[in-house]
């Protein structure tokens, strides 16, 4: 049985800290607790406006954790330079809109193919694994393969927002796209809006190798603590994976 990895996004620890402008809660400490509880990687989204995690946080997290740092960034030159300075294990390139509350859609690989190819080439030359956050659309996935991305992260936002009846169609689309990406030689990840309830159907897609989950785990941690919140998610992932073997 292949292990499904869990990346824990700690952005919203910083969001809570920034409400009062102090030092606590510290995203570095929570990243360490997530790792102790079984997180396979730590994800941070370093935004252009530093609305939650900032560059200092990311550097401290990288120095403090034993697992992998996955850095989500926009494709602006300034942000790519920050990634080069930080040198994370992996970078996930995402679209960014200053007015959005959270990432609203996947990156348009087709439209930005030439530029993205240069960015990917530069990051990979420094030993950084590169992922593209894409909507479950075959043409976007094909373009991701053509510009030598290592991975795609399928946007599960639409699936996560729908009720049970509607999301059957979306989950089938995600399955098809995951299989397609796998055939193209891309490693497949998934994330956005996943929680302790809707993650179960995603776990059953064998081509998906890693999930990135943040808000629901951080929210749960306010009730049960960070380590228990991560363990509960890992238990759900493991039990569902076993069930479908």
From Swiss-Prot:
Its EC number is 2.6.99.2. InterPro entries: Aldolase_TIM, PyrdxlP_synth_PdxJ, Pyridoxine-5'_phos_synth. The active site is at residues 45, 72, 192. It catalyses: 3-amino-2-oxopropyl phosphate + 1-deoxy-D-xylulose 5-phosphate = pyridoxine 5'-phosphate + phosphate + 2 H2O + H(+). It comes from the Bacteria. 1-deoxy-D-xylulose 5-phosphate binds at residues 11-12, 47, 52, 102. Keywords: Cytoplasm, Pyridoxine biosynthesis, Transferase. The keyword Protease does not apply. Pfam families: PdxJ (PF03740). HAMAP family: PdxJ (MF_00279). This is Pyridoxine 5'-phosphate synthase.
